[in-house]
Amino acid sequence: MSSKTASTNSIAQARRTVQQLRLEASIERIKVSKASADLMSYCEEHARSDPLLMGIPTSENPFKDKKTCIIL
């Protein structure tokens, strides 16, 4: 590979890197303490509708067997 091609590839790679860094720098950031407080608040507000915390009523559970086994 010639040095001209290598330098062209290097410049293209550097431009992609700069573009990616500019994109990342423009992202709005919040402090971890605020993000965790918001997450805790969201979890507490939606806890009643969370089936993993409250469970699924047996009448609404589509995976529960409708009838028992005759052998048992």
UniProtKB/Swiss-Prot annotation:
Where Cysteine methyl ester occurs, the residues are: 69
Lineage: superkingdom = Eukaryota
PROSITE patterns this protein is in? G_PROTEIN_GAMMA
Q: Where is the lipid attached (S-geranylgeranyl cysteine)?
A: 69
The entry's cellular-component GO terms read: heterotrimeric G-protein complex; synapse
Give the Pfam families listed for this entry: G-gamma
Q: Which residues carry this modification: Phosphotyrosine?
A: 42
Keywords, in A-Z order: Acetylation, Cell membrane, Lipoprotein, Membrane, Methylation, Phosphoprotein, Prenylation, Transducer
> Is the keyword Membrane in the record?
yes
State any GO BP term from the record.
Answer: G protein-coupled receptor signaling pathway
Propeptide segment residues? 70-72
**Which subcellular locations apply to this protein?**
Cell membrane
Q: Which GO terms describe its molecular function?
A: G-protein beta-subunit binding; PDZ domain binding
Which InterPro entries does this one have?
G-protein_gamma-like_dom, GGL_sf, Gprotein-gamma
- Phosphoserine occurs at 10, 26, 49
Tell me where it mainly resides. membrane
- Residue positions, PTM N-acetylserine: 2
Subunit structure comment from the entry:
G proteins are composed of 3 units, alpha, beta and gamma.
**This protein is called what?**
Guanine nucleotide-binding protein G(I)/G(S)/G(O) subunit gamma-12
Please name the taxonomic classification of the source: Eukaryota, Metazoa, Chordata, Craniata, Vertebrata
